[in-house]
From Swiss-Prot:
TM ranges: 25-45, 68-89, 100-123
Co-factor binding comment: The heme is bound between the two transmembrane subunits.
Known partners and oligomeric status: Part of an enzyme complex containing four subunits: a flavoprotein, an iron-sulfur protein, plus two membrane-anchoring proteins, SdhC and SdhD.
Name of protein: Succinate dehydrogenase hydrophobic membrane anchor subunit
GO biological process, one term: tricarboxylic acid cycle
Localization, UniProt: Cell inner membrane
PANTHER family attached to this UniProt entry: SUCCINATE DEHYDROGENASE HYDROPHOBIC MEMBRANE ANCHOR SUBUNIT
Topology feature Cytoplasmic, residues: 1-24, 90-99
Keywords: Cell inner membrane, Cell membrane, Electron transport, Heme, Iron, Membrane, Metal-binding, Transmembrane, Transmembrane helix, Transport, Tricarboxylic acid cycle
Gene3D superfamilies in the record: Fumarate reductase/succinate dehydrogenase, transmembrane subunit
CDD domains per UniProt: SQR_TypeC_SdhD_like (cd03495)
């Protein structure tokens, strides 16, 4: 039995997995850098408000700059987690139907969490 290496090489080159993999890799790195920058803001915010009352902290959170940074932090962290969970699911789940279902569930969970967070931020007292 002779194994056809040429057919396998052509098959692997014709699939666009390398392009999507590079894009996925780049997205993970970009979201990681954004999260690192946002974590500096979060650490600064925690240290500057460590002795304040909860009402003062909530008032600080309602400033537009802090709301925007907080929304960016939560959204990017959830998107970063979706990217990571997708890699884990694709690597360890062999059944295609289950794999696709789990990826959709993870994406929906993160979308619902982002929407709930936005509603909680803008509709809090």
């Amino acid at each position: 039995m002779i194994y056809d290496f040429k057919a396998e090489i052509i098959k692997s080159k014709s699939s666009s997995s390398s392009k999507s993999g590079a894009h996925h890799w780049l997205l993970q790195r970009v979201t990681g850098v954004v999260l690192a920058l946002c974590s500096f803001w979060l650490i600064y915010f925690m240290f500057t408000n460590k002795n304040n009352d909860i009402n003062i902290i909530m008032w600080e959170f309602k400033k537009p700059f802090n709301i925007v940074i907080l929304l960016i932090t939560v959204t990017i962290s959830l998107y970063h987690s979706v990217l990571g969970m997708r890699v884990v699911i694709e690597d360890y789940i062999n059944c295609h139907k289950l794999r696709n279902t789990l990826i959709i569930i993870v994406k929906l969970f993160c979308i619902l969490t982002i929407v709930a967070f936005i509603v909680a931020i803008f509709y809090s007292e």
